[in-house]
Structure formats: C-alpha cells, structure tokens
Amino acid sequence: MRVEGIQRNWKQWWIWGILGFWMVMIYNVRGNLWVTVYYGVPVWKEAKTTLFCASDAKAYDAEVHNVWATHACVPTDPNPQEMVLENVTENFNMWENDMVEQMHQDIISLWDQSLKPCVKLTPLCVTLHCSNRTIDYNNRTDNMGGEIKNCSFNMTTEVRDKREKVHALFYRLDIVPLKNESSNTSGDYRLINCNTSAITQACPKVSFDPIPIHYCAPAGYAILKCNNKTFNGTGPCNNVSTIQCTHGTKPVVSTQLLLNGSLAEEEIIIRSKNLTDNVKTIIVHLNESVEINCTRPNNNTRKSIRIGPGQAFYATGEIIGDIRQAHCNISRTAWNKTLQEVGKKLAEHFPNKAIKFAKHSGGDLEITTHSFNCRGEFFYCNTSSLFNSTYTPNSTENITGTENSIITIPCRIKQIINMWQGVGRAMYAPPIEGILTCRSNITGLLLTRDGGTGMHDTEIFRPEGGDMRDNWRSELYKYKVVEIKPLGIAPTKAKRRVVEREKRAVGIGAVFLGFLGAAGSTMGAASITLTVQVRQLLSGIVQQQSNLLRAIEAQQHMLQLTVWGIKQLQTRVLAIERYLRDQQLLGIWGCSGKLICTTAVPWNSSWSNRSQEDIWNNMTWMQWDREISNYTNTIYRLLEDSQNQQEKNEQDLLALDKWQNLWTWFGITNWLWYIKIFIKIVGGLIGLRIIFAVLSIVNRVRQGYSPLSFQTLTPNPRGPDRLGGIEEEGGEQDRDRSIRLVSGFLALAWDDLRSLCLFSYHRLRDLILIAARAVELLGRSSLRGIQRGWEILKYLGGLVQYWSLELKKSAISLFDTIAIAVAEGTDRIIEVIQGIWRAICNIPRRIRQGFEAALQ
C-alpha cells in the first residue's frame, strides 16, 4: 500500500511540474517586448523649409505682384481643407518664425524683379535750375507752399553728342539745393539720391497694389495653425489645426498703421516680444477696422523725356486745376473709439498708470510719418493729430471728439523712394496721371514705448515702423512649419520570424491634411490610420509635382524660370528626398512596403520602463517620441545590425542543401506544396477517367448505329440476249422481263421517252425516300445523343460526388490515423518515461533487497 501511494504522489508531482514548466515558459515569452517599426505615425518637429506660394494671379495682369505670382505661384485650392487636431497642445512663437523671414525675402525679390528690366536714371544726376511752381491763370489757388518745383535741365537726346533743355515738375522732397540755400527759394538743385545711391525708374505700366498670397508647405511638411481667438503670439495653444496653405496675406508695405490685414475675432490683442523692454515693437491687432480715405487732388499729366538712346524718363508735365495738398480722412468717432480700446488693453499690462499716445519722436521721413503706396504714388502722412491723447484707467472721460467729424491728416508725396529692402538703393516712381483716391482699412498699429524714469505714473506710446517683418508677422503670427516624422518605434510582444524565405509585399508608397488627423489620439487608436496617412503623404508629393508643372507650363511662353521657379523645384526635390530617405531606412531595416514591421531587436527597459498597456492606451505618438528621442539613433543602429545578421543567416542557410534539414519538411510552406501536388494528381486521375468514359460511350454509340445501306440489291432488267426463266418458275413475271417488240420510228421514240420518264420518276422517288429516311435517322440519332449526353452529365455528377466523398473519407481517415498515431505515440512516450521513473524510484528498494538477500 505504501508503494502504491508513493507512485501516485510522484505521478501528481510529475504532472504539476510539467504544467509549471510550461507556465514559466509562456510567461517568459509573453514578458519579452520587441521593437516594432510603424510607418505613418502622426509625429512632427519644428523645422525650417522652403515654402512655395499659391495665388489667384492672372497672367495678363501687369501689376507687379500678379506678375510675380503668375511666374512663381501655383493656383489656389478652391476647396482648402483644415484638419483640427484634438487633444493637441503646441507651442508657437511669432517672433522666431522662419515664415516671416521667408516672406520678407520674397517681397524683396519681388521688388527687385519688378525693377530689373526698368531704366536706370544715372543720367539725371545733373544740375537742375528750379523755381517754385507759379500760377499762370486766374482763379487758381496754390496752397502747397513751394511743395512743387518747376525745374529745367540739359539732357542728352537720341544722339549722344547733342543736348537739349527740358522742363519737369519735381516734389521738393526729391531734390536738395546745391548750395546752403533755403529750399523755398529758386536756384540750383540736384536729385536727393545722387550722392548716396543708384536709382532705377519703376516701369511705367507697373503698379504696386498687392494681392493675397498663400504660403504652402511642401509634401512631408505641414503648417500648424493656432485657432485660439485670444492668442498673443507666444506660448502654448490648445486649439490647433493642420493646413496645407495659409490664408491670403497681402504684402502691404506701410509704417505706423497696418492696412488691409486680418482682424482679431473677439477683442483687441496686444503682441510684443517683451512688453517690459521699451526697445521691442508692440503690434496691436484690432478687432474692428477703421476706414481711411486718401486723396491726391492734383490732376497731374505725365510726359516722357528722352535721356538717351532707347531710354525715357517720365516726369510730371503739368497740373490741371488747383494745386492742393494730398491728404487722408479718418472718422474721428471711429478712431477715438479704437484708440480708447487700445488704451484700455495697454492699461491691463501697465496697471495704475495712465496711457498716453504721442507723435513719433523723430527720424527718417519713412518712420516719422505713415508711409504707404496709393496706386503707384508713395504717400507720407503726418499722424500727429491721430496720436495726441491720453487714456486714464477708472476715468469717466473718453477720448472722443465732435460727433461725425473727420480727422484730416496732411500727406506729402515722394517720387524718389529709399528702398526699405536695404541701404544704398533707391527707386523713382513715375507720376500717375489724374486724380488719385485710395480707400483702405486700418487693421493694426505699430507702437513703441518710451523708456526712462521721467514719468512714473504715465506710459507714453508712439507710432513706429520701418521693419517690414513686423507687417508680415502681424499676419503670420498663428502659423508654424513642422516636419512630419512618419517613422515611429514602439515596443510590442510580436517578434519577427527569422531565417525564413518570405515574399515581401510591394510597397504602396506614402498633405496631406488628414495625415495628422490622429495626432491627439492614443498610440493604439492612431495606428489603425497608418494606411490613409501614408497614401496621403505620397499623394501630397504627386499633387505638388502636378501643381509645379502647371505653374511652369503657364510661364512657358516666356521661357522664364526666376528665383521663384527655383524655389518650386527645391520644394519638389526636398519632398522626394525625404520620402526616399524614409524608404531607404525601411529597406535597411527589412521593412520595405510595410506599415507595421516587427523586428528581432529586444526592447531595452532603459529606453523606457513603461508597460505596454500604459504606452498604447495612455500616450500619444508625440509624447512617446519625446520620451525616447534620446535613444532613437541607438535603436536605429540596432535595427540595422539585426537586419544585417538576419540577411547573413539567410545566406548561410540557403547555401546548405535544404533536404539536409528534415525539420523543413514539416514547415507550413512545404505542407501547402504537398497539398497542391496531391490535388493535381487527383485532378489528373479524375480527368483521365472522364476521357476514357467518353471514349467508351462513343464506341458504344458507333456499334449500335446502322445507317441505310446503299448496297441493297435492286432487280436489274434483263438484257435482250438473256434467256427467260426455267419452266418450273411460276408466278407473275417481272416487268423487266416483259419486252415489247415495237417497230417504226414513232413507236421506238415513244418507248424510249416512256422509259426515260419512268426512270426519272423512280430515281426521284428513291431520292426523296432516302432523304426522308436520312432525316428520320438524324432526328433519332440527335434525340439519342441528347439522352446519352444527359446520361453522361449524370454520370459525371455521380463521379464527382463519389470522388468528393472518397476524398472526404480519405481526409477523415488520414486525420483519424494521425490522431491515433499521435495519441498512441504520446501514450508510449509517457509509459516509457513512467517506466524509467519507476525504475529510478525502485533503485533504493532493489539495493535494500539486495543487501537483505546478501545478509541472509
């Protein structure tokens, strides 16, 4: 009894030991994490890249921005898409935005391009004999106070050795006296730029009215947009969307006042890099526009003056009517209300202090006045009357004036413009004929704050300007460019099967706007959108190439490829290079054409000790990328080393005879091949059986078919030399044997005719009977054939059913046999192991019995 109990206990311990061993193995297998590569994850990083532009410019427009946009920009998308990124917070900084620098360089190149084919006015650096413009006719007034000078000078004609005296009108701001004389007197003058910079005359048919320009990111990059209505330009933004192109930005060149821009959606926004630093410019974004109407009332005429062969200088010829000063009109009520709101917002940043607005403290004319372009004429308007008020917090007084009154600010006009792009460059703007009127909207202010410690209870703000980057920054403050990083790495429990020959799927490739649509989702939720994101990346590249080809085709008639065309090519090449670089990495890692690629690289807990559930259920791809960014290069190197080792192992394995490794016989690939060969053999046997059955049926049909015999004997008529029947013959004699003996020509002819008719009748009757018999036999044969065909089909159906049952029985028998063999083999193995174990367990007892026997 004790022996049986010991055996039973050992058997239980053996079973529990096996179960525990397999549980430990399963736990170890499940506990390991492996590096998995994902292609198309919503991850990005801040980047600087070449942007291209889109515009609605027309090729036939002569306006300078349109000319530039036609040559450089692709058509705008009629249905722009914007994808909101849920649960995403992104940092923006309008003061360190590369988009602003790019737009600045683009506008500089725009102006340079517009002046490149125009006339250089170096020959105009001559002595000008000028006097104040006088009134030649009655009933005309001149309130300009010597603002316009009537100058005469000698100029070279078409023939270089001949000169002639010409007259032209110049603004006083464009000329300086040669001697220390008052500019109000008559005397000798020169153009203001002759001792400082070269001057180029703007082409006469070109104006400077801007059109909206959209900046677009190339494929592989995206533009993030902050949609917070009170965003001040810096810091985090929790309402982010991704777009392909910005809104249309008008490149308006102006100082002090921002014109024709976008408006704040809710309240006035104050933006500055550092409000406590009085050197930094303050950009005020208005929520309501203030209309400003500017007019040059003088009805000017323009005349052309020859300054050399093939060169013409355009100057003001005459002023028709009164000579009046240019000016701008602003509604006093609207302006005072706006300034009141601006003062209120500034007081929030400077509490317990009065906010005072004052005129500019001094400097160049371009920054001390509100300078802008009006239909080709450059205005410089004095804004002292606009910025001359004080806002006191908690005061009942408002900055208001007479209701419905108008603020009129005087303006001066210059034709020689110091280019804002750089020092030492100037441009001559030809006079525009007729009366000029411009209507614009003030959408922002450029201010600066006085420093020092003079007034502790008052902050003085003055209009500022001059750096056109602030103009572009006021429109591009809510955008930033990011680079898409479609390659993601994360730990999973799936491991790559190694040292196997596999057919890799052909790659499908990789805008664009839906690409980052899952950015705020968890990693597990975002991974299901990889296919869509990868396809949109490739479609973005293709779409950009298509747009580029259309843009080049539009300018093909002029055979021009300016710097803008080069930028387009750069963006195209950049997008393709990024795509190829990602595909190269996937190829090096053995992941070509795969969106999710398992690897044989184990995950190191030093990279991240988070659990798999925590990573995939609680983190976004952006958060995960930031966490492992320091180890990305290390993981990339390990992936490359693993793939190299994998390829080396495959090469070594393929070098051996595959039949030497019997284990490969039981691989799933070989079993599929065995099944395919078996199906082919069975199909061949069934086909042979069908062929022999058909041949047998045909043979039987042929044996049972007896056609009408054409050898049936018919009674032949006896000849005239044949004897009659014997005497014993009885019965009626045949008609052939009746021979009529006729004589005479008519009788013979009649007999022959009768014989011919009878012969024809009998032959025709026989032919009809044969045809009827043939038709009858053919019908019977056809019916018999249809019946036999139906029998053949039934036979084939039965044959197929029989063989299917046989195959089913064979398969069931095969599986039963395998199951029985496996069960019996398992039982035998268990019995052998139990026997060995019992033998081992009985060794002490046998030794004891041996000692007992020896001692006895």
From Swiss-Prot:
Residues 151-194 are annotated as: V2. Glycans are attached at residues 87, 132, 139, 150, 154, 180, 184, 195, 228, 232, 239, 260, 274, 287, 293, 299, 329, 336, 382, 388, 394, 398, 441, 604, 609, 618, 630. GO terms for biological process: adhesion of symbiont to host cell surface via host glycoprotein; clathrin-dependent endocytosis of virus by host cell; fusion of virus membrane with host endosome membrane; fusion of virus membrane with host plasma membrane; positive regulation of plasma membrane raft polarization; positive regulation of receptor clustering; viral protein processing; virion attachment to host cell. Residues 699-856 are cytoplasmic. Residues 567-585 are annotated as: Immunosuppression. InterPro entries: Gp120_core_sf, Gp160, GP41-like, HIV1_Gp120. Residues 1-31 form the signal peptide. Some of the most genetically diverse regions of the viral genome are present in Env. They are called variable regions 1 through 5 (V1 through V5). Coreceptor usage of gp120 is determined mainly by the primary structure of the third variable region (V3) in the outer domain of gp120. The sequence of V3 determines which coreceptor, CCR5 and/or CXCR4 (corresponding to R5/macrophage, X4/T cell and R5X4/T cell and macrophage tropism), is used to trigger the fusion potential of the Env complex, and hence which cells the virus can infect. Binding to CCR5 involves a region adjacent in addition to V3. The membrane proximal external region (MPER) present in gp41 is a tryptophan-rich region recognized by the antibodies 2F5, Z13, and 4E10. MPER seems to play a role in fusion. This is Envelope glycoprotein gp160. The lineage of its organism: Viruses, Riboviria, Pararnavirae, Artverviricota, Revtraviricetes. The gene is env.
